[in-house]
């Protein structure tokens, strides 16, 4: 029992009550901690919490098949000690290993078996990292101290701020002459046609009353010469384009 010295809390599972007090006292002296007592036939009805004991000692181990329950009752790296067992130790060791215990060993001279609970809690998980992590490259990381901001006012020149001439936006004006293309779609063909008609009407303007040359006092209300000074009879007067068009 010297290998269990320093364990704080132990459980002694007994089958024979004869000299039980002496065996429990010997375990207390060996460990230096507390020792709880439980009957092997009442083990399945016990309600011990998980990870309650540092050491569990069982006498006559063939009388219990609750090794999984004992595994849960032990703390991580807790010890399981069996003595006074009957039969081949190999079969008992195999059963203990299949229940989750590790580091199982036999002391044939003392007729004892010792096993250990793994150093982690039952049901716990750990992250496994099999692949090597490649160092991340800060490709898109920009330092504000090293990067200068662009002044928006410097993006435009004075030429960019000038408004373009509407006449220069027409496709037909690329030739340098005011001549409409064959399939004109910019409106220049209609504009030139209106100018042509207006010019013809201006040149052929005639007086219907014969008093147009006398001045506004003698002109009709719809006379195209209204507002113009008097002129000599037969004198050719060129009218502005807007005077020959309707105001509505």
From Swiss-Prot:
It holds the Pfam family CIAPIN1. A motif (Cx2C motif 1) lies at residues 209-212. Transmembrane segments: none annotated. GO terms for biological process: iron-sulfur cluster assembly. Its cofactor is [2Fe-2S] cluster; [4Fe-4S] cluster. GO terms for molecular function: 2 iron, 2 sulfur cluster binding; 4 iron, 4 sulfur cluster binding; electron transfer activity; metal ion binding. Residues 131-161 are annotated as: Linker. It comes from the Eukaryota. GO terms for cellular component: mitochondrial intermembrane space. It is found in: Cytoplasm; Mitochondrion intermembrane space. Residues 4-130 are annotated as: N-terminal SAM-like domain. Residues 172-186 are annotated as: Fe-S binding site A. A motif (Cx2C motif 2) lies at residues 220-223. Residues 209-223 are annotated as: Fe-S binding site B. This is Anamorsin homolog. The lineage of its organism: Eukaryota, Metazoa, Ecdysozoa, Arthropoda, Hexapoda.
